[in-house]
Amino acid sequence: GRGGALGALLLSPRSGALPSTHSLLQEAQGLPHGTACTAARQGGGRGRGGNAWESPEGCLMFSVLLRTPMGGERVPFLQYAASLAAVQAVQSHCAGDDLGLRIKWPNDLFAEGQKVGGVLCTSAYREGQFEVLVGLGLNFTNSRPTTCVADLLAARRPGCSLPSREALLAGILERLEEHAGTIEACGFTPLRDAYTALWLHTGQEVRFEDGDTLVVEGLADSGFLLARRKGGSETFELHPDGNRLDFWTGLLRRRVPD
């Protein structure tokens, strides 16, 4: 096998601060599968598209290295697995309450209409397998700039104690490991219902400039959105155009043959 469980080797700076957990793992050579890196603060984090992502004190942040022989068509689903793992871990550590945490496709975590976290995955193919770095940031005790797990828990479950950062991190990694194993063996299909039960998009209408309106129905086998023409039966996959900061402002339609 590949050795240790996710997080069996955990790197954490003594000062608490790092430029980026992702960069540290990316630049280090020969780290074993499952190596994770966490920091209390990072100043050079990255979001999707290489955008700078500052992470203040109070965020739960980590990156973890996965080495996997899964096919390239399955690798993109690991970002969905990470989002799902985060919401499930919060639920299991917060008295069974998911705190209204929801997944905004493809890789953001929202609560009360505000972004509270996000996932970044990068991959490289080496020696017959993929090396995938999964990075996740979640507002844990920092009430700014939006809201955080601590505030959501206090509002919804007064008197319920906040889990430790370490316990929540362990819970996320445990579930991510389980989900990655499922994707490797069977693809994302066994996880799809759990994922779409926790996302924001079922029934969401997407309007196009030509007046066409599509209704999101779920996730296609490709990992893109599956939508149906409003009032019709034609099915489409919705793809981001790759040039927009917000996926939802630039979706491209591709008709799915009947």
Where are these regions (language model features)?
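N-terminal lobe of the biotin/lipoate ligase/transferase fold
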Residues: 1-96, 160, 251-258
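Long, positively charged amphipathic alpha-helical accessory segments at protein N-termini or as interdomain linkers
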Residues: 7, 69-100, 111-258
